[in-house]
Amino acid sequence: MNAEQFDIKIHAVEGGVTAAAGFKAAGIHAGFRKNPERLDYALVVPDKPCPGAGVFTTNRFCAAPVQVSRANLGGAHKGCGVIAGVSVNSGNANAATGETGLACARETCNIASQVIGCEPQQILVASTGVIGQILPIDTFETAVPAAYEAL
């Protein structure tokens, strides 16, 4: 598919990810990346849990955050649910990490749900960065509360 065949105009939206009323977001340096000047963790939280949907890869070999977020939205065929927060890290993709990566993604949902005050299934997780390295869960234990305080 060639994107040039579509007549789509993309416009920047003032306010970024929090342009929609009722959403807060914070980005911090949590330590996923070595450079302390680079933000590497973000938390997006609606004022109250809200309907959410996701579109995910159909690749059988998808990363742990994709598998966990898909499950939290009701599985591969449903793709929608109630969302109370989105946890995003950069510097480590948590991909090709097997059961350890899945456990980390699930524990990230647990940590975020305790901080936000919701069910773990209401948290989505996303990771980008180096593939094949184990993501340190202890970084989330400090990052999530710090980002929540910064909202």
Question: Which residue ranges define each predicted feature?
Answer:
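Alpha-helical support elements that line or immediately flank enzyme active sites
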Residues: S87-I116
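Short beta-strand segments
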Residues: V44-V45, S87-N89, V125-S127
